[in-house]
């Protein structure tokens, strides 16, 4: 199948036309309207500094039902000890920059380019991209960020500078998302790390159907507060 070159307007081809590896289209920009259109259609950007903007819709898709969250026993002990304090939207830009700096086994460089950082900071200022932070005292020990639309949360990346910090942030974030009415967490592609927490692969068509239902719900827009579920302030 051909790889589509995006037009100037924020429109995308049918995800069913993606390559076997999930690559769907190339080009366009990272303006908020295009990013939000992409997420609403089950498409996300992923590229490195040496590549043009690439857009993906893999099949199968990894997702987590917040109600199906599994917490490994060893992590349950860490949570009970209260080693880390978890917050939301307290340090978004610091979180995304640490995710960009994180070394990943078998990967040279980062896909979170300066252009990507700027794009998601813009979404954060619009109240549509959010971070969860794990703190060890006053030190940022780990965290994650993603995008919220309707009753869906699209996880993007996480980092840890201390043992289990990102795992604690992830568990607390999913617990909060569930209490706030979020129906699915998009984990994009399979990793054994996320499978251990209850994520599972589903056919792209099933993911898109569930996403469409989730988008019928209102978006939790604004600054989130972890201490209280429901609509943010």
Swiss-Prot record:
<dbReference type="InterPro" id="IPR016181">
    <property type="entry name" value="Acyl_CoA_acyltransferase"/>
</dbReference>
<dbReference type="GO" id="GO:0008914">
    <property type="term" value="F:leucyl-tRNA--protein transferase activity"/>
</dbReference>
<comment type="similarity">
    <text>Belongs to the L/F-transferase family.</text>
</comment>
<dbReference type="InterPro" id="IPR042203">
    <property type="entry name" value="Leu/Phe-tRNA_Trfase_C"/>
</dbReference>
<dbReference type="GO" id="GO:0005737">
    <property type="term" value="C:cytoplasm"/>
</dbReference>
<keyword id="KW-0963">Cytoplasm</keyword>
<dbReference type="GO" id="GO:0030163">
    <property type="term" value="P:protein catabolic process"/>
</dbReference>
<keyword id="KW-0808">Transferase</keyword>
<dbReference type="Pfam" id="PF03588">
    <property type="entry name" value="Leu_Phe_trans"/>
</dbReference>
<dbReference type="InterPro" id="IPR004616">
    <property type="entry name" value="Leu/Phe-tRNA_Trfase"/>
</dbReference>
<dbReference type="InterPro" id="IPR042221">
    <property type="entry name" value="Leu/Phe-tRNA_Trfase_N"/>
</dbReference>
<protein>
    <recommendedName>
        <fullName>Leucyl/phenylalanyl-tRNA--protein transferase</fullName>
        <ecNumber>2.3.2.6</ecNumber>
    </recommendedName>
</protein>
<keyword id="KW-0012">Acyltransferase</keyword>
<comment type="function">
    <text>Functions in the N-end rule pathway of protein degradation where it conjugates Leu, Phe and, less efficiently, Met from aminoacyl-tRNAs to the N-termini of proteins containing an N-terminal arginine or lysine.</text>
</comment>
